[in-house]
Each structure stands twice: as structure tokens, then as C-alpha cells.
């Protein structure tokens, strides 16, 4: 691993850890808000990614198999954090548990087959990459076909769903091309270029999630409220819906 690659990993780790710090600040600001526990759960995404990049910078989990270098912690990070990203999108869309589990499993299998392709050669490499690509396509089917059909007719929920869906969907179009062009594929770009690109994409895909959730927190709270109403739980007091106050109240940014 070259010095430039190590530097790229450290820079990504710092970016993710800053993201965790921002999450902590937002968590404190949302004291008393029903959105607080959701924000804490979202912190797992930049937090786990940051720890993974620290390990990658230290060379932990990087092995050579059949002459190919596998950055193991990169794939461990992806198999943990990216299913959470798409699962959260499904939850925001009001999707069923089965659909959310389906998109998360498809995401994890995409990562697993991609990792297997890295350490394979010849026809097997491209066959495994093809299987990974099929799972990648299935993710877009969930994001752009299945999930949109079940979103409540609420502008805030639809707006947040569209933001998250397009943020992840557009960024993830780049990943298979980086893989193809990099050392794992045809080798058009080197390890340094691939490492820099992956680090940039990872940070851009994950850290802003906390901000998106905070900026449109009222829409996410509405998801919880609408589900409670659908189950017949209804308002808790006097037949009136709870009134959002303090940091839960809608703002111009919402």
C-alpha cells in the first residue's frame, strides 16, 4: 500500500469521524425530540465507516489472494453500512418489513459477490461481477419501482424519500465503473486513483445522511405517526394529534 493510498484512507477516516461529531451535536440539540433515537441509529453509518477506514489506513484486513489485493475492511464496511442506507430509504417510504429486508439482503449480496470477484480470475471473476451487477440492478428496482408505490401522499415524506433515493442512487452508479476501471477490473486506473475515488464516494454517500435527516426531521417523524395511525393507535390525548414543539416544529428549512 502506497503512501498516497494510506493518506486517502486517513482523510476519509477523519471525514467520517467529523460526521460522527456532527451527529453528536445534532443529537444534543434534539433533546426531547422523538427523532432523537432515529438520529442515534443513523450515527452507526459514519461511525462504523470511520472505524473501518482507520483500520484500512493501518493495513488491517488487507490481504493478497491469487495476486489480487483485497481491502477486506472496505467490503466489511460496505456490507454493514450500505444495507442500512437502503433500508432507511425503504423505512421512510413506508415499505413493508419484507421489502426492506429484501433490499438489504440484495445490497449485502451485491457486496459479497463483488468481493469474491476481486480475488477470482478469468471467467469466474467476470461471472461473479455479473452476479453482483444483477443485485445492483435489483437495488434500483427497489428504489425507483417498488418503494415509490407505497409512499403516503404527503409532500414532506415524498420529498425526503426523493432526496435520499436520488442521493444514493446517483452516487452508486459510479461504484461499478470504478471497480471495472481499477485494479480489480481491467486495470485502466491504478490503486491510488481507485482508493481516492472510493473514499470520496463513501464519504459523500454516508456523512450527509445525518444532515438530511436533521434538515427534514419533521417528515421522518410523520412516518412514525402515520404508521401508528394505520395500526389504529391514534392520538394519545383527547383525540388530538400531538403538536410538534421546539426542535420538532417545522421550520422554513423543512
Swiss-Prot record:
Top-level division of the source organism's lineage: Archaea
Keywords: Cell membrane, Chromophore, Membrane, Photoreceptor protein, Receptor, Retinal protein, Sensory transduction, Transmembrane, Transmembrane helix
Main subcellular location of this protein, as a coarse class: membrane
One of the protein's GO biological processes: phototransduction
Topology, Cytoplasmic side: 27-35, 94-96, 152-154, 224-254
Gene Ontology cellular component list: plasma membrane
Subcellular location: Cell membrane
Extracellular side of membrane: 1-4, 58-71, 120-123, 183-190
N6-(retinylidene)lysine found at: 206
Family: Belongs to the archaeal/bacterial/fungal opsin family.
Protein's job: Involved in the control of phototaxis.
Protein name from the UniProt record: Sensory rhodopsin
Amino acid at each position: 500500500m502506497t503512501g498516497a493510498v494510506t493518506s486517502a484512507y486517513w482523510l476519509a477516516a477523519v471525514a467520517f469521524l467529523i460526521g460522527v461529531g456532527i451527529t453528536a451535536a445534532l443529537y444534543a440539540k434534539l433533546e426531547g425530540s422523538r427523532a432523537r433515537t432515529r438520529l442515534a441509529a443513523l450515527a452507526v453509518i459514519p461511525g462504523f465507516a470511520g472505524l473501518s477506514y482507520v483500520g484500512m489506513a493501518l493495513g488491517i484486513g488487507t490481504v493478497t489472494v491469487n495476486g489480487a489485493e483485497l481491502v477486506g475492511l472496505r467490503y466489511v464496511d460496505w456490507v454493514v453500512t450500505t444495507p442500512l442506507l437502503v433500508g432507511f430509504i425503504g423505512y421512510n417510504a413506508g415499505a413493508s418489513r419484507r421489502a426492506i429486508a429484501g433490499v438489504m439482503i440484495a445490497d449485502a449480496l451485491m457486496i459479497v459477490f463483488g468481493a469474491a470477484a476481486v480475488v477470482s480470475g478469468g471467467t469466474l471473476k467476470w461471472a461473479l461481477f455479473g452476479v453482483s451487477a444483477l443485485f445492483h440492478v435489483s437495488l434500483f428496482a427497489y428504489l425507483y419501482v417498488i418503494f415509490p408505490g407505497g409512499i403516503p401522499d404527503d409532500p414532506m415524506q415524498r420529498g425526503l424519500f426523493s432526496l435520499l433515493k436520488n442521493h444514493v442512487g446517483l452516487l452508486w452508479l459510479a461504484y461499478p465503473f470504478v471497480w471495472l476501471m481499477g485494479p480489480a477490473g481491467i486495470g485502466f486506473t491504478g490503486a491510488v486513483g481507485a482508493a481516492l475515488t472510493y473514499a470520496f464516494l463513501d464519504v459523500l454517500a454516508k456523512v450527509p445522511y445525518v444532515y438530511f435527516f436533521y434538515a427534514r426531521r419533521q417528515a421522518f417523524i410523520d412516518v412514525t405517526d402515520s404508521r401508528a395511525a394505520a395500526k389504529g393507535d391514534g392520538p394519545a390525548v383527547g383525540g388530538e394529534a400531538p403538536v410538534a414543539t421546539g426542535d420538532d416544529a417545522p421550520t422554513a428549512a423543512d
